[in-house]
């Protein structure tokens, strides 16, 4: 079970059919053990080769969520832990200042695709199984359910998020397939659309879903301009992460950045305005990244010519 908890299951009296099931289970368990050892060796090689490593506590949480089926049922890892995964996917090491966090942010759509099986992944149960002391964080409005879980006295925290609807309601949304409430946030549907598989590297590997690098970068540009003045540090972190990803994409995958920009344009003038403001802000944080994005995105190049 999630958290490595052993569970006994009674499958009936011993019969030839049951004996075959047991034999097949033992064979598959042996094969799984061999696969797990291979993954652990691979992760050790990645660590030795300089891959970005997720801290042990966060990796335990992500493994429990993955084991419970969260990422199979549409959950997407976002935030700084996703940034770490993207670094390994792109074969790069990010600056350490942009990697500091113990916040585990998981986003999902409130409605489920008909292509997904009618299964459930119980997030509160998965966190409880870890026996790390996770407790629900009370909402500011006592009438609303919690959308976060935190270990008392520590910085480790899990936030559950969902795209904000067109009605712009910030009221938590109950998501039945995860047995949890999620906090609606604007611009999130752009980020998690078309998410792709990735791996968290620690002592072993954890398969998860992360945003595409291009959407991750453009989303960071947009939300950096939405941060309140009190969150200036987070805004700077947004810009730093966006600049680093953009620098790589312009050199190696300019087409995917252009496609992601077209997706921004389809969402209207407000989205374009915020994204351009983010591009302007990058010039202060990383002038080279600003030059690169202006060379690839026509709207940024035109704006630079005007200024």
Predicted regions and their residues:
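Compositionally biased terminal segments of proteins
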Residues: 3-307
């Amino acid at each position: 079970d999630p958290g490595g908890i052993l569970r006994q299951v009674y499958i009936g009296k011993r019969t030839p059919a049951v004996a075959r099931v047991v034999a097949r289970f033992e064979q598959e368990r042996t094969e799984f053990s061999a696969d797990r050892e291979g993954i652990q060796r691979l992760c050790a090689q990645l660590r030795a080769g300089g891959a970005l490593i997720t801290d042990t506590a966060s990796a335990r949480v992500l493994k429990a969520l993955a084991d419970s089926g969260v990422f199979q049922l549409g959950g997407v890892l976002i935030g700084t832990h996703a940034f770490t995964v993207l670094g390994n996917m792109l074969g790069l090491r990010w600056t350490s200042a942009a990697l500091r966090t113990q916040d585990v942010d998981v986003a999902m759509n409130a409605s489920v695709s008909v292509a997904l099986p009618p299964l459930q992944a119980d997030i509160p149960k998965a966190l409880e199984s870890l026996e790390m002391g996770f407790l629900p964080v009370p909402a500011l409005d006592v009438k609303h359910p919690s959308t976060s879980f935190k270990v008392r006295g520590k910085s480790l925290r899990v936030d559950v998020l969902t795209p904000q609807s067109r009605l712009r309601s910030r009221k938590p949304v109950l998501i039945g397939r995860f047995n949890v409430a999620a906090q609606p946030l604007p611009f999130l549907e752009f980020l998690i659309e078309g998410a792709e598989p990735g791996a968290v590297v620690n002592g072993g590997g954890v398969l998860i879903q992360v945003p595409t690098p291009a959407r991750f970068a453009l989303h960071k540009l947009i939300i950096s301009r939405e941060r309140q003045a009190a969150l200036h540090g987070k805004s700077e972190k947004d810009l730093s992460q966006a600049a680093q990803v953009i620098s790589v994409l312009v050199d190696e995958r300019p087409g995917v950045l252009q496609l992601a920009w077209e997706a921004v344009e389809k969402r209207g003038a407000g989205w374009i305005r915020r994204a351009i403001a983010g591009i302007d802000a990058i010039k202060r944080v990383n002038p080279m990244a600003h030059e690169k994005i202006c060379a690839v995105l026509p709207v940024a190049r035109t704006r630079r010519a005007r200024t």
